[in-house]
């Protein structure tokens, strides 16, 4: 099952091509802009109502902001930055990259509810057949604690001579 927050107009039923059977859609104007606490509260309501025991996020900036709050709210074990789907053959074990990617740790999670955030490209998705059932979910949505009053996008480029930090990389030459 999946959760879609906000007034999304795209064809979310098409997520069924990736194995999602049911999508709980929570439409509310308060969900227009990300407020991690508000999102965590709404996702907790959906998870509890559907009886979810595993909640999966992408390890994006949004996932990194929401998943720890949801973990605290649901008293759930959290593994952030997983590099593979969980192994459930003997409990619930998640593989995670550690020491700047130089090693891997297998983390066992024993709480009744588990939350993981998957690193990009942790597993390959392949489109198949099917459509998901989209169900409207009525959640209590708190007023956001932060209000977005405007969005100013940066334009143009910083010239190389005016940049505060310049990062350069290369293979170099083996000789003069």
Model-derived regions: residue spans:
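N-terminal glycine-rich FAD/FM-binding segment characteristic of electron-transfer flavoproteins
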Residues: 1-176
């Amino acid at each position: 099952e999946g959760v879609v927050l906000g007034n999304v107009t795209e064809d979310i039923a098409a997520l069924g091509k990736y194995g999602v059977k049911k999508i709980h859609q929570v439409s509310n104007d308060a969900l227009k802009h990300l407020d991690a606490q508000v999102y965590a509260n709404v996702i907790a309501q959906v998870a509890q109502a559907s009886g979810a025991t595993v909640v999966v996020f992408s390890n994006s900036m949004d996932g990194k902001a929401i998943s720890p709050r949801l973990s605290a709210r649901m008293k759930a074990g959290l593994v952030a930055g997983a590099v593979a789907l969980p192994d459930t053959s003997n409990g619930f074990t998640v593989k995670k990259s550690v020491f700047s990617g130089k090693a891997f740790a297998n983390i066992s999670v024993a709480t009744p509810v588990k939350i993981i955030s998957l690193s990009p490209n942790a597993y390959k998705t392949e489109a198949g057949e099917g459509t998901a059932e989209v169900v409207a979910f009525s959640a209590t949505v708190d007023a956001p604690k932060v209000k977005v009053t405007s969005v100013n996008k940066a334009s143009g480029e910083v010239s190389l001579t005016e940049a505060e930090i310049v990062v350069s990389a290369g293979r170099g030459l083996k000789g003069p």
